[in-house]
Every structure is written in C-alpha cells, then in structure tokens.
C-alpha cells in the first residue's frame, strides 16, 4: 500500500535537516535557508496532491526478460554520487540538482497534471542560457585541494574544447560558477541570473572526470537522461524497489521546462542515472535497459558520450560558428573550434572521421578488419600482462573496426575470452565496448562471458570495438562475416543527422 505522507517533509529543522543545510549552504553560498525550504515545499506539495494518480504504479514487477539479465555481481568498490548525496537528498531534485523557484513551479505543475509529451532534456528558458560570445566565468573555492582543482580543470577544458562555449577563471565576475567543496556532488541547472554566482559542488569524491563533466553539464543547462518524457520506451523504472520518499527523483520532465533537441535516448550518456539509484534493496536494479546488452552502459562516469557533446552543441547552436559544414563520416559533426575539420565519435579520428584511432593501451593490436562472406577469426589484445596495478579512474583504450563492402551488413560474435574471472557489473577492470553502427551513441559494455557466441548484426557495413583496460591485459577472440543487407540503401545509422 502507498501512503501519501511519505512525500511530505515537515518544515522543522531537525538534526538531519540541519546537517543537510550545513552541507549545502556553506559560507560562500548566496542561496538561503528560506529559498531552499520554499523550493522543497513546492515539490513536496505537488507530490502530495498527485498521490491518488500514482496508486497502482508501485510494486509492479519488471518483465522477466529484463529482470533475468546476467551482468555479474554488483560493483561495490566505488560510491556513486547518488550515494554520496544521501545526506542532502531532501533538498535536491534527482539527487544532484538544485532547483530555482521557477523551475520548481514548472515541475510541480507537471507532477500534478502528468504533462509529458516531448523528448526534452535541456533548458528552454533563455534567461538560463549562457552566452557563446562571453566566457562562462568561474572561481575555485580556496578549500579545494590542488588535486581537486587539477581534476576539475580537465572537465572545464573538455567542455571548452568540445563546444562553442568558452570558460575563463575570474574571481570577481558576475554570474560566475563557484566550484566548491560543499557536501555532495550537485549543481544548479543553467545560468542563475538572480545570483551573483552559483555553486557547483565538485569536492573530494565528486571531482572525477566523469562526475565533474556531469555537474558542469547541469550548469550548462541539461537535465538527466532518464527525465526525458519518452524514457519509458527505453528503460523500465521499478517503482517497487524505489524508496517511496525518493520516488520524485524519477519524475519525467515537463514539456515546457526543457528544450526539444531531437536527440535519441543514449543509455551511456554521462547524464544517465546509476541503475541502482534510490533502491530499497540495493542488490536489485531500479532502472533496467529495455534494449539487450545496454544495462552496463547506464550510469557510466568515464566521460561524456558523443551524444552529450552533440546535445551541448545543438543547445547553443554551435554549428552557426562555421559558415560551411564539413561532410563528416561515421556520425561526426563540424568542429566549431576548427571549421575545417570534424569532431569525431571516440571510435574514429582524422579530419573527416574515417580513420582508426591509434589507441593508448600498450601492446594494442588495433586493426581494420575486412569482412567477407566467410567467417573470419581475429584474436585481439591490449594492455600489459605484467602489470598488476590498477586504477578505476584512468583507463587505456584500443580500437578495432570491422568493415564490409557497401550495401552489406556484418554478423559478429565473440568466441573466446577470459572475461569470466573479471565479470562484474560496470566492468571496473577490463571491458569491451561494442558499437554496431550507431556511432553517435554509446555502445554495449561487456566484461562477462555470457556474451559468448551471441550473434549481433551491424546497422550498416561497419562495427567499432573498443577495449577498455584499467588492469593487466585484455584478450578476446571474435568471428565476423559479411551478409546481404536487409535495409534500404538510403538508411542512415547516424541518429543525430
């Protein structure tokens, strides 16, 4: 049975509430207790009013085909920011977002009315947009360590290099980002024009590259991937395993609160929730991918996906910086920082995205493999077999392409791998990313031998593989062949074009 009271938090500052506010409203934060309480009340009241409409949704078991997927034991080695933010969850939306009053009211209206109709994932209020002609100014909290600052600088540089937005350090500029060591990992969404500066909390445990780029993407103007109105077509949200008082964190975004970018859903977006977020039983998923093979892609914090880069470039119309658009292969886009070259998905390099990256892993035997009508076999390897040190934050890569003649597709399977010994959810040590041709989206991540001898078919006439190595050496064997295409000749696998 579902009880309405779980969504209402009394406005009395007890010890947990006081602790949460102390973490958020540190000395430098221009926000206030009054404002945070007001915004919390707006969301709480909306869910209190909506309760009769959601009865019956709780406790529904996920379809057996989704629940039975085997991705190995859960990875409990690193804490996710959904866990790091437990102490402040009552004042955040979707775990790491600080809403302003206008955003809270829009979301509250959607909560009460069930108003979802579009594929939206970025801000629509132009007052929350940053200018492409003026830098986004930022300042580092003096409480951040040199290591914290160095890590966050890499994330800032990433968005500077991969969009038409520019960033500049200035401790006195108006409307600057204040990169803080406040408790937890969080940010406001978009530019907060009513604040002299806005905080982005990226202190210890929140300064990894993936998490820092995630929080900066909020500040740039993006919501979470699973907030999209069309998310139920791609993921199953198991409300029966979600802490009732945290169910509001799975709210789909209001149609008038987010920008329509016509982007496909990407399981590997850096803005996608961790699949155990807010679980009652932390050994069971709260979010399950409906597409086979993509469960391990969700919640990745290695780096932004190429679709995230495309999203930021679309939101700020970065293509307008170039008078002539490049003809890019393999889902690449014109680089707004250099209009004479393409910006490529990670599986490709070169001025027009048609070359194989050299890879960063030692002993990488990356290659372009030509498929014929007969099954061919290839033994792949990358990494140092004598290395037994590991880092889950830094990985090396090796790439392989499989190509068939134009007008044909590729059948592909993995036939041999020692992955059983390292099979674990999220694949923290070694993994293989398989992209069947939607190169502007993140691929399937696997590190378990359950994938062996499953036959996959490419979208068109190319498959890209990426070996991800954080420990020792990755080895695996594959088989592949070319087959007649079942798709029209005009098919374009690039979903963003």
Swiss-Prot record:
Ligase as UniProt keyword: no
Domain CUB: 364-483
Propeptide: 15-120
Catalytic site positions: 215
Glycosylation sites: 76, 317, 394
Note describing how the cofactor binds: Binds 1 zinc ion per subunit.
GO cellular component entries: extracellular region
EC primary class: hydrolase
Disulfide-bond pairs as recorded: 164-318, 185-206, 328-339, 331-342, 344-353, 364-398, 427-447
An example Gene Ontology biological process: proteolysis
Record-annotated EGF-like domain positions: 324-354
Domain of life: Eukaryota
Keyword set, alphabetical order: Cleavage on pair of basic residues, Disulfide bond, EGF-like domain, Glycoprotein, Hydrolase, Metal-binding, Metalloprotease, Protease, Secreted, Signal, Zinc, Zymogen
The enzyme's E.C. designation: 3.4.24.-
Matching Pfam families: Astacin (PF01400)
UniProt keyword Phosphoprotein present: no
One example GO MF annotation: metalloendopeptidase activity
Named cofactor requirement(s): Zn(2+)
Localization, UniProt: Secreted
Signal peptide from the UniProt entry: 1-14
Domain Peptidase M12A: 121-319
Binding residues annotated for Zn(2+), in chain numbering: 214, 218, 224
Function text: Metalloprotease.
Descriptive protein name: Zinc metalloproteinase nas-28
Protein source organism: Caenorhabditis elegans
Lineage: Eukaryota, Metazoa, Ecdysozoa, Nematoda, Chromadorea
């Amino acid at each position: 049975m579902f009880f309405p009271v779980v969504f209402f938090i009394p406005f009395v500052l007890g010890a947990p509430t006081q602790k949460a506010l102390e973490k958020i409203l540190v000395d430098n934060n221009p926000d206030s207790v009054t404002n945070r309480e007001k915004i919390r009340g707006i969301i709480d009241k909306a869910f209190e009013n909506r309760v009769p409409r959601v009865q019956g949704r709780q406790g529904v078991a996920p379809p057996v085909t989704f629940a039975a997927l085997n991705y190995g034991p859960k990875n409990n080695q690193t804490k996710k920011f959904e866990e790091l933010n437990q102490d402040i969850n009552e004042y955040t939306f979707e775990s790491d977002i600080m809403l302003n009053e206008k955003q809270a009211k829009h979301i509250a209206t959607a909560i009460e009315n069930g108003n979802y109709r579009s594929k939206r994932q970025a801000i629509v209020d132009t007052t929350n947009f940053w200018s492409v002609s003026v830098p986004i100014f930022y300042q580092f909290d003096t409480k951040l360590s040199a290591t914290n600052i160095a890590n966050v600088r890499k994330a800032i540089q990433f968005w500077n290099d991969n969009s038409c937005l520019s960033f500049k350090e200035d401790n006195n500029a108006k409307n600057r980002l204040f990169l803080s060591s406040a408790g937890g990992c969080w940010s406001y969404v978009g530019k907060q024009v009513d604040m002299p500066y806005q905080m982005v909390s990226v202190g210890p445990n929140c300064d990894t590259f993936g998490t820092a780029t995630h929080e900066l993407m909020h500040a740039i103007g993006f919501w979470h991937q699973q907030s999209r109105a069309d998310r139920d077509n791609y993921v199953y949200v198991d409300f029966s395993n979600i802490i009732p008082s945290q169910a509001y964190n799975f709210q789909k975004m209001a149609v008038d609160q987010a920008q329509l970018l016509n982007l496909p859903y990407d399981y590997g977006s850096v803005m996608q929730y961790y699949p155990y977020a807010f679980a009652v039983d932390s050994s069971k998923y709260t979010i399950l991918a409906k597409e086979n093979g993509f469960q391990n892609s969700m919640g990745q914090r290695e780096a932004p996906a190429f679709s995230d880069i495309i999203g930021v470039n679309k939101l700020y119309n970065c293509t307008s910086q170039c008078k002539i658009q490049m003809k890019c292969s393999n889902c690449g886009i014109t680089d707004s920082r250099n209009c004479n070259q393409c910006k490529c998905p990670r599986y490709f390099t070169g001025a027009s995205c048609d070359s194989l990256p050299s890879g960063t892993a030692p002993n990488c035997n990356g290659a372009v493999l030509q498929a014929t009508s007969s099954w061919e076999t290839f033994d792949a390897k990358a990494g140092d077999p004598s290395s037994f040190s590991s880092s889950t934050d830094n990985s090396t890569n090796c790439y392989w392409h499989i190509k068939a003649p134009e007008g044909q597709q590729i059948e592909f399977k993995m036939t041999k791998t020692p992955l059983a010994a390292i099979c674990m959810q999220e694949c923290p040590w070694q993994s293989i990313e398989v992209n069947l041709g939607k190169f502007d989206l993140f691929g399937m991540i696997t590190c378990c031998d359950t994938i062996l001898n499953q036959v996959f078919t490419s979208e068109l006439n190319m498959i890209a593989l990426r070996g991800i190595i954080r420990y020792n050496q990755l080895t695996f064997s594959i088989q592949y062949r070319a087959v007649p295409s079942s798709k029209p000749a005009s098919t374009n696998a690039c979903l963003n074009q």
